[in-house]
């Protein structure tokens, strides 16, 4: 089974979405990430429509609230036909457990329960921000390890983390966990707003379960060719 390459759709409306999606290939061959911008503009209906068309969907809303609110939010998201969704690991173990319970409760009987991924530290967070703004005295690796360990114990299926941290996490948190990594840039591409980045080949070698790639695919002259090239490099 090939490892997923997930296309980050950093778009804000359905018109732009409909212009891009046909350029990526057949729906059954495409795994997409929908974030806050598109979801908040177009609403849950767009997610359900895309799921019904055959797209695999990572709905990345990074829920972070009191457990009861997150439970009900996750329960609603589970009805949309998504494959992955996210919470912030910093929300704590009770919130993570509530999200997992909500996904189970909301999933239709004939569907698979979406995988719950906990966001550790965003790939835009540098060591300076971690130490001087978040007032965290741990190293980045130790902070991510702590958050990942908490998330696994609370019932999360995996974490969102930098590819730079995957090898260490696999050794210390375990192989029976998903390690989904943004911050992927093919060689020669600009880092944009990411601080901790790697190439698809490096992510493969370090053990990422799946990678998330946005602009190097969506802004390419031939998005489908760029997508297929990254899939090949990662698998």
Swiss-Prot record:
**Its Enzyme Commission number?**
4.1.1.23
Task: Describe the reaction catalysed, as an equation.
Answer: orotidine 5'-phosphate + H(+) = UMP + CO2
Gene Ontology annotations for the cellular component aspect, listed alphabetically: cytosol
- Top EC category: lyase
Q: Which domain of life is it from?
A: Bacteria
The Gene Ontology biological process annotation of the record reads: 'de novo' pyrimidine nucleobase biosynthetic process; 'de novo' UMP biosynthetic process
Query: Does the record's keyword annotation contain Lyase?
Result: yes
Q: Which SMART domains match?
A: OMPdecase (SM00934)
Keyword entries, A-Z = Decarboxylase, Lyase, Pyrimidine biosynthesis
**Catalytic positions?**
62
Q: Tell me, what's a Pfam family for it?
A: OMPdecase
Q: What pathway or pathways are given for this protein in its record?
A: Pyrimidine metabolism; UMP biosynthesis via de novo pathway; UMP from orotate: step 2/2
Residues given in the record as substrate binding sites: 10, 33, 60-69, 123, 185, 194, 214-215
Q: Which InterPro entries match?
A: Aldolase_TIM, OMPdecase, OMPdecase_AS, OMPdecase_bac, OMPdeCOase_dom, RibuloseP-bd_barrel
Say yes or no: keyword tRNA-binding present. no
- Supply one GO molecular-function term: orotidine-5'-phosphate decarboxylase activity
Q: To which protein family does this belong?
A: Belongs to the OMP decarboxylase family. Type 1 subfamily.
Subunit composition?
Answer: Homodimer.
Task performed by this protein: Catalyzes the decarboxylation of orotidine 5'-monophosphate (OMP) to uridine 5'-monophosphate (UMP).
Mind telling me what this protein is named? Orotidine 5'-phosphate decarboxylase
